Regions:
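A residue-level marker of the well-folded mature domains of exported/periplasmic proteins
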Residues: 2-5, 26-270
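Sec-dependent N-terminal signal peptides of Gram-positive bacterial secreted proteins and lipoproteins
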Residues: 6-27
């Protein structure tokens, strides 16, 4: 996970650099004005450990980009899971004189007001982690998106689970030749959750693992919610669950915390 955060942060910082070059080339700003680069980072929440870690890594990457000619100031705000509030925070960042905006949308389908505000002030916007729909990204040439390779993450998850299952036949506790599984999904409609789920399951099937889906629960990428959802699943299916998959580490930790309270034989997959 640390490598994943670092990779996204590096891509973000590189994209910021590219956006600044475009901005400098088109704006006619003086060298004196450009000595300080103000970057505004607005996340969807302040309660997501992955996003918080990613923000910290981005700050470190940008700090490393500073030199005698340029100082970089990073300001951060949270939308607190409310798109209207996030829009207001973006407006505050624009009024404060930010040169570049990095935005982790609350609602990936509702970036229009943010795009309009930024475009009016000619401020590049880099969306990250939650990708706007293509039609929105095509509204303006100074809109960018940086995110993880969710397909690859799903494939890797499926490969790890398949390797364990194929070498541990005892996972199939009821000996029916199928693996009964439940799934903790990150968020309804989130492109990463959709891809990770799809490709983890496809990869297991390609590895000759026959699956039977018992249920899934949305846990919003959150450890506490995952623990609560696992409580429901265990209450309903008990030891009939042979495999648990989750879309991110936080939900996996919540799942483990719940399972630790009531030990279940068999393997749970990450």
């Amino acid at each position: 996970m640390n490598k994943k955060k670092r990779r996204v942060a590096v891509l973000l910082s590189a994209t910021i650099g590219s956006a600044v070059l475009v901005l400098s080339g088109c704006s006619g700003k003086s060298d004196q004005t450009e000595k300080t680069l103000r970057v505004g980072v607005i996340t969807y929440t302040q309660d997501d450990p992955f996003i918080n870690g990613l923000t910290d890594e981005l700050k470190a990457q940008l700090k490393a980009m500073e030199n005698k000619e340029r100082r970089i100031i990073v300001s951060t705000k949270s939308g607190n899971d409310d798109q209207q509030e996030q829009n207001e925070k973006v407006e505050e960042m624009i009024d404060a004189g930010c040169d570049v905006l990095c935005i982790n949308l609350v609602d990936r389908t509702a970036p229009s007001r943010i795009i309009r505000m930024a475009r009016n002030e000619d401020i590049p916007v880099i969306f990250f982690n939650r990708e706007p729909v293509r039609e929105d990204l095509m509204q303006w040439e100074k809109l960018y998106y940086v995110g993880c390779d969710a397909e690859q993450s799903g494939i890797m998850q499926g490969e790890i689970a398949a390797e364990y299952i194929n070498s541990h036949p005892e996972v199939d506790k009821n000996k029916d030749g199928k693996i009964q599984y439940v799934l903790l999904e990150g968020e309804a409609g989130h492109q990463d959750a959709i891809s990770r789920t799809e490709y983890s399951v496809k990869t297991l099937m390609k590895k000759d693992v026959i699956l039977e889906k018992l249920s899934y629960q949305l846990a919003d990428w959150n450890r506490g919610q995952a623990e609560n959802r696992m409580n429901r699943l265990i209450s309903q299916y008990g030891k009939g669950i042979e495999l648990v998959m989750s879309n991110n580490d936080e939900m996996a930790l919540g799942r483990w915390r719940r399972i630790g309270k009531q030990a279940m034989p068999g393997k749970t997959g990450r």
